[in-house]
C-alpha cells in the first residue's frame, strides 16, 4: 500500500470501470514466471535482460497519460496477477472479455510456463478468482501469476483509448 496525497481531480479508483470501456495493459506480463525460472537456475541470460528491462520500466508516463485521457478506473498489475487486478475493476454491472492472444508476454515466458515454472502465488490467486469465476480454466494460471513492477490496467472509453494509444 501507499500513503500520500493526491489532487482530488487526479484520483483514479480501481473499481469504477464503466460499461463499454476498453482496458489497456501498459507492460508485458511474465515477471513472476521469469523470476521463478531464475530461482530454479533455469533462466536464460537473454530472458533475464528482458525481465530486468520490464521491472525497470516505470509507470510514470502511462499514469500521466491516464489522467490526461479521462480514465474511468486504473490498477497496477502486481501480487494478484492480471486476473486478480481485473477482478478488482469489476462490479455487478460489468464483465470483462479478455483476448488472450493479444496479451503481451515477456520473451520466454510461455516456454517456462509450459514446463511448470509457476509461482506458488499464481495457484493462490487462481483459487481466489475461481470463487467468482467458476468457469475459469487452469490454463489461465499464467494470467494469475504475481507480477513485480507490473504495468497498469487503464479503463477508459474507446475514443479516449484510441487517443491515448496514439
Model-derived regions: residue spans:
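Active-site phosphate/oxyanion-binding loops
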Residues: 38-50, 132-136
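Residues on a specific face of well-ordered alpha-helices
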Residues: 18-21, 27, 31, 49, ...
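Short, hydrophobic/aliphatic alpha-helical segments
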Residues: 18, 57-71, 137-138
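Residue-level recognition of alpha-helix initiation/capping sites
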Residues: 14, 56-57, 81, 159
Amino acid at each position: 500500500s501507499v500513503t500520500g496525497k493526491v489532487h482530488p481531480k487526479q484520483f483514479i479508483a480501481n473499481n469504477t470501470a464503466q460499461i463499454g470501456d476498453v482496458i489497456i495493459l501498459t507492460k508485458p506480463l511474465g515477471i513472476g514466471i521469469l523470476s521463478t525460472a531464475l530461482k530454479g537456475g533455469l533462466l536464460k541470460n537473454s530472458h533475464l535482460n528482458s525481465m530486468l528491462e520490464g521491472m525497470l520500466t516505470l509507470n510514470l508516463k502511462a499514469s500521466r497519460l491516464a489522467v490526461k485521457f479521462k480514465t474511468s478506473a486504473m490498477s497496477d498489475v502486481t501480487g494478484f496477477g492480471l486476473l486478480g487486478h481485473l477482478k478488482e475493476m469489476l462490479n455487478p454491472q460489468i464483465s470483462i472479455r479478455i483476448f488472450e492472444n493479444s496479451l503481451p508476454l515477456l520473451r520466454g515466458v510461455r516456454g517456462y510456463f509450459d514446463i511448470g515454472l509457476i509461482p506458488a502465488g499464481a495457484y493462490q490467486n487462481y483459487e481466489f478468482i475461481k470463487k467468482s469465476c467458476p468457469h475459469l480454466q487452469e490454463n489461465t494460471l499464467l494470467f494469475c501469476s504475481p507480477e513485480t513492477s507490473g504495468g497498469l490496467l487503464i479503463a477508459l472509453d474507446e475514443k479516449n483509448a484510441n487517443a491515448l494509444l496514439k
